[in-house]
């Protein structure tokens, strides 16, 4: 399994993850954000590129690897492979960061839902956001109001090209 998808794996050619989207996530009143997209790997790769270029703290959780920094591949959170341990770490961590989760549907059950509700309602976790990325993000009953939803539709049409030093479609 590829732990850190690269931006070269992009099939859409579209840049979705921009500093404006990052700011929208950081400034969101909700601590839980869902990005609904059919291109989850591309979105994760673009978050990685943003983290590398800007130095922002963006982390990615995978079941087989736990929480890992997208900015520095070698930085991992020990003991975070289980979803509940990762959520506890996020709840207790004093560090700012955006935590990305994909393929999380099977983990949306107790005790994880309790931890997610705690994170969503807590004001002490300000600056730490959990972002679910994928096309099948169905939150348990009553949790939809705790999540800010962002939709990403891949643009169909001409691929961008460079003209006079600017990208145009």
Task: State where each predicted segment sits.
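ATP/nucleotide-binding catalytic cores
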Residues: 2-169
